[in-house]
C-alpha cells in the first residue's frame, strides 16, 4: 500500500514518518518463564502536526490456524520527535507498568532502549527492554527484547506487520 507524507508533518518527525498509519499482522513470542506463542497485532500511529505521534497497540493470542484464542497486551503512548532523528517514547501498559524509552531513527529504522520503568503493586517484575522497528520492503518488522522475572535482557517478541 503506498504511503504519502502528510502536509502538516512536523520536520522533526521526518525520520519516523514511515510509521504513520495502521499496521497489522502476526508475530511470535517466547521467554524462559513462559511457553512459546503466536499472536496477532495491530499498531496505530497518528499525528496532528505537532512534534509527536500518538501510538496505540493491541495484541491477541492466536492458534496454529491463526484464529484468535484470547486478548493479550495493550499499550498506548506518545512517540516524541526531537531534532536529528532522536526520539522519546512514553508508554503505558494494561499489565500495570509505564516506561520511558530513548532512541534514534534513521534510514527506515528506529532503535529504542528503556530509561525508566514504573510498576504497579500487582504488575509482574519487569526491568527494561530494547525495541527495533524497521521498514523492510514496505512492511513493519520489529523485535522486542525484555529483561523480566529475574531473567537478563533477551528476545521476547518479533513480528512482521503490513500497512492496513
From Swiss-Prot:
Pathway: Nitrogen metabolism. The keyword Heme applies. It comes from the Bacteria. It catalyses: peroxynitrite = nitrate. Binds 1 heme b group per subunit, that coordinates a highly solvent-exposed Fe(III) atom. Its EC number is 5.99.-.-. CDD domains: lipocalin_heme-bd-THAP4-like (cd07828). GO terms for molecular function: heme binding; metal ion binding; peroxynitrite isomerase activity. Forms a 10-stranded antiparallel beta-barrel structure able to accommodate a hydrophobic ligand in its interior. In fact, this fold hosts the heme group, which is located in a wide surface cleft. Heme-binding protein able to scavenge peroxynitrite and to protect free L-tyrosine against peroxynitrite-mediated nitration, by acting as a peroxynitrite isomerase that converts peroxynitrite to nitrate. Therefore, this protein likely plays a role in peroxynitrite sensing and in the detoxification of reactive nitrogen and oxygen species (RNS and ROS, respectively). Is able to bind nitric oxide (NO) in vitro, but may act as a sensor of peroxynitrite levels in vivo. Belongs to the nitrobindin family. PANTHER family: PEROXYNITRITE ISOMERASE THAP4 (PTHR15854:SF4), THAP4 PROTEIN (PTHR15854). This is Peroxynitrite isomerase. It comes from Nocardioides sp. (strain ATCC BAA-499 / JS614).
